[in-house]
Amino acid sequence: MSENVMTPKFRVSFPDVFRPGKADDGGKQKYGVMMLFEKGADLSALIAEANRAGVEKWGADKSKWPKNARNPFKDQGEKEYDGYVPGAVCITAKSNQRPGLVNMKNEDIIDESEFYAGCYARATVRAFAYENKSKGIAFGLQNIQKLGDGEPFSGRVKAAEDFEPVVPDGVKEAESKTAADLFT
């Protein structure tokens, strides 16, 4: 039987924790999060749990496991997103049920702006092996604890990077005043 395993600290990407996200394969929408671990993070407990799930499903002889079984441990370098580090591991964990979500004081997080792509967290997950349209090992998301803030991943540039300052027509730059300056 699968047990909850605590992840090391990770950076949050693609959080679908307040409402289920879109299913990649057109299947049922699920809650989930992509966990971006730092290079060198101790993933031994997660690896052991994934192996346990595989042994439970397919037996101890790994040569008899499905040849093209999906591996839950991915290289962040496979994705071309800001904040993804080639050679570091990422794992996606999903759930049919909304995960519990707390802050460092173990208080529920209900404000969606408090938990975002780019913040830091840890989670409890359960490994399971599956055989349906495909075969593999995955992690079920149980609960999440936010550990800190980080630079948000937004997928967009700041407005100030898109535009140059503009001086109104007919006004020299030195004459340009702010609204507050008009009354002084």
Where are these regions (language model features)?
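OB-fold/S1-family single-stranded nucleic acid-binding modules
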Residues: 131-151
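OB-fold ssDNA-binding interfaces and closely related basic DNA-contact patches used
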Residues: 1-90
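Exposed beta-sheet edge/beta-hairpin loop segments within beta-rich domains
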Residues: 105-120, 128-138
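A short secondary-structure junction signal
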Residues: 46-48, 102-104, 132-137, 155-156
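Beta-strand/loop nucleic-acid-binding surfaces
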Residues: 92-110
